[in-house]
Regions:
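ATP-binding Walker
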Residues: 3
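Walker A/P-loop
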Residues: 6
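NTP-dependent small-molecule kinase module
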Residues: 11, 15, 87, 122-152
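ATP-dependent small-molecule kinase phosphotransfer cores
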Residues: 22-81
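A glycine- and Lys/Arg-enriched "phosphate-lid" helix/loop adjacent to the NTP-binding pocket
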Residues: 84-124
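ATP/NTP phosphate-donor binding region
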Residues: 143-224
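A glycine/threonine-rich phosphate-anchoring loop and its flanking beta-alpha core
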Residues: 239-326
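Active-site segments that bind and position negatively charged phosphate/pyrophosphate groups
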Residues: 324-350
């Protein structure tokens, strides 16, 4: 209903290397009628045809980008399908903007502003009931699709942001734990069942460090590892999660600039061998990545400079001077760029 789905879904599909399909257009093609013509026979007729198309598309293998019309959410079977088979992103745009975009068009719901506003308010609750994430721009859609949450102050809401309801093991290094560990523990609340420390830096990415962590862990298959720290911590803890009990969920909470804009995004996890770095690992996507730019305020200058080198590289690839942005926008933009690359090539095949 004027939220910009067509524009954003098209751009997202291009960035993520996915096929985009417009559900309304497929309904028209399979029916041999336009949407207004179908609606003339009654909205229930359209909803039946829409459901048939949704069942087909959501049952196909592979990753598709599906653009549903705003009214699809009123169908209980479609809501159930979206909960079970899709990552659903709600494009949340204010009602005035939506009406301005569609008024005067031939859309069935664009003929009466009062009715449009009533439906807008009514459907918001339905959107919220199925949405996995909310976005209002392309970066937001990319981040949501990759399971990346960027928010200043997110560490304080960590308990809300870690998916599931099972116990959590917090893994960090001594330095980061000393600065942010208590806040993370308080945020996790009753879900926190155990805490563990890995050595700082590359020492975390050794078999000896992970062997000790695996032996200390007491989580079951319903537990989640939360990795709070820089790229070495998230690399190691992610691989620990990938191998422990043949794989349990994990959530990186990167605290360094390098990790926030690059290392902690996507499914690559690894440890080192004497012969070289990252030689043993697994692709194990986090159930969510929680990025709090406020954590950068305690970052030593040397680590910030290291991170800015990654920002400059990302900016050059993106064709934008990202290094000129303030921290919050810089992190969000770089994270979205990396997330798009990971969505396009999740197994780093090049």
């Amino acid at each position: 209903m004027g939220a910009g789905k067509t524009t954003l879904s098209t751009a997202f599909a291009e960035q993520a290397g996915r096929q985009r399909l417009d559900v309304d257009r497929i309904v028209e093609e399979t029916s041999g009628q336009t949407i207004p013509e179908i609606f003339a026979a009654g909205e229930s007729v359209f909803r039946e045809r829409e459901l048939a198309v949704a069942l087909d598309l959501l049952g196909r293998p592979g990753s598709l980008v599906l653009d549903f019309g705003g009214g699809a959410i009123t169908s209980p079977p479609i809501r159930e399908l979206l909960r079970e088979r899709a990552i659903t992103i709600w494009l949340d745009v204010d009602v005035d903007t939506c009406w301005e975009r569609i008024s005067g068009s031939d859309r069935p719901l664009a003929q009466d502003e009062t009715e449009f506003r009533r439906l807008f308010d009514e459907r918001r609750l339905l959107y919220a009931s199925v949405a996995n994430a909310v976005a209002d721009d392309l970066d937001g859609v990319i981040l949501a699709a990759a399971g990346v949450h960027v928010e200043r102050g997110a560490l304080r809401r960590l308990g809300e942001l870690v998916p599931g309801a099972g116990p959590v093991a917090l893994v960090s290094d001594p330095h980061v734990a000393g600065i942010h560990g208590m806040e993370a523990q308080l945020a996790l609340g009753a879900r926190l069942s155990e805490t563990h420390e890995l050595p700082p830096g590359e020492e975390a990415k050794t078999l000896a460090a992970l062997d000790r962590l695996w032996q200390e862990l007491r989580l079951g298959r319903g537990g989640t590892i939360v990795a709070l720290g820089g790229g070495c911590t998230t690399d190691a803890a992610g691989f620990a999660a990938a191998a422990y009990l043949r794989g349990i969920p994990w959530v990186p909470v990167p605290s360094s600039l390098v990790a926030q804009v690059d290392a902690a995004i996507g499914g690559k996890t690894a440890i080192d061998l004497p012969q070289g770095k990252n030689l043993v690992g697994a692709f194990h996507w986090p159930v969510r990545t929680v990025i709090d730019p406020a954590l950068l305020e305690t970052l030593p200058d040397a680590q910030r400079h290291e991170g800015m080198a990654e920002v400059v590289k990302t900016g050059l690839l993106a064709g934008e001077p990202l290094w000129e942005l303030p921290d919050d926008r810089l992190v969000r933009r770089c994270a979205a760029f990396k997330a798009a690359l990971c969505l396009r090539d999740p197994f780093d095949k090049g």
